[in-house]
Amino acid sequence: MIGIPAASILEKAETILLAGAGGGYDLYTGLPLYFALRAAGKTVHLANLSFATIYASTGKRIGPALVEINARTTANHAYFPELHLAKWLKDQNEPDTIYCIDRTGAAPTAAAYKYLCEHLNPDAILLVDGGTDSLMRGDDPCLAPHRKI
């Protein structure tokens, strides 16, 4: 069996923040994990670094560089992967809230994640990437200290 370090962390976690790391449609690559974690009884919150014009939507601005959307959110632009996903999730009878992080730089992104951690209190954060713009193992030495579960 392949030993994936994140697997043991996710097994112990009850609440997980699953986030697209590179933006755009990256969050979609995490959907198999989302459904597996939900089937295991976990609470899973979704977030994504967004390339959409999130402030031009009816989503709720809840923190620094952070907008909460759901299937009832409206937008005047067609490119909004998170909104399409929220509507699809609602059609699947799944929770449809997605947290969109504006791509404004490292400090606002870190502040958005801090806000999400303070308000959602996840036991684990899992970043997913659909390409190669993020190659990390999760225990990389340059990452901030993480909580052991």
Predicted regions and their residues:
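Short, charged beta->alpha transition segments
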Residues: G3-A6, N76-L89, T109-P122
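Glycine-rich nucleotide/cofactor/substrate-binding loop typically near the N-terminus or early
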Residues: F35-A39, V44-I101
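Short acidic, glycine/serine/threonine-rich loops at helix termini
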Residues: T29-G30, A56-R61, M136-D140
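Positively charged, low-complexity intrinsically disordered leader regions
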Residues: M1-L17
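Internal, conserved structured core segments that host functional sites
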Residues: I101-I149
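Short, glycine-rich nucleotide/cofactor-binding loops
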Residues: L18-Y28, P141
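Short beta-strand segments
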Residues: A19-G20, N48, L127-G131
